[in-house]
Amino acid sequence: YIRSYIPYRQFALRNYYQWGMPSNKAWDKLVLEGHNTNPNWKLTFEAHPAEMLFDLEKDPDELHDLSGTPEYAEILSKMRQALSDHIRVTGDLGFFLPTSRTGHILYDKVRKEKYPLNELYTLVETAGTATTASLSMLEEAITNPLSEMRFWGVVGYAKLAREKQISSCPQALLALLQDSNPYI
């Protein structure tokens, strides 16, 4: 089971030093200009679904996503819930922006300030799979005083816009262009 909380980003992480090398520039050119003959080569350049499920015994290279296959729906649901439970039990801090980590120990800060981690986790899980039914949650998030909430609200809007589920940009979202946090 693979979960992507920002599914509209390309599949591969870009190491900009490595990607600046002549061989990687040639690879970019080959794939992006449509000259490759292997569709798997293009996978790292494309966005991907929020969730993917693979049978590692039958498909060790993880090429055949089973997340949309009805006979795997129950397994997908169990994996989704197991991950959701895990991030809550462990108090996962991986959804915080880099600017949230300066000048203090984040672990101590969220406990001392009684940070609403469960609200953050719910928003994060919703943002990557957002639908128009999520708009009220996203609207509330982008006006939240907590920068992480605003960031993940923006992620939800970006997902909806990319999929053409929304056709206009709310004023509160436009206002975030002037946000003091550069990650938003």
Predicted segments, located by residue:
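Structural helix-adjacent loops and short alpha-helical linkers that scaffold large soluble proteins
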Residues: 71-74, 164-166
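A short structural micro-motif
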Residues: 73, 85-86, 159-160
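C-terminal, low-complexity/hydrophilic appendages and adjacent surface loops
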Residues: 1-68, 74, 106
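Acidic active-site catalytic centers that drive phospho-/nucleotidyl reactions
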Residues: 55, 59, 144, 179-181
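Extracellular/periplasmic ectodomains of large secreted or surface enzymes and adhesion receptors
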Residues: 45, 77-78, 82-90, 95-141
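Structural detector for internal amphipathic alpha-helices that build alpha-solenoid repeat scaffolds
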Residues: 114-132, 148-164, 175, 183-184
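Amphipathic alpha-helical scaffolding segments comprising HEAT/armadillo-like alpha-solenoid repeats
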Residues: 131-143, 163-177
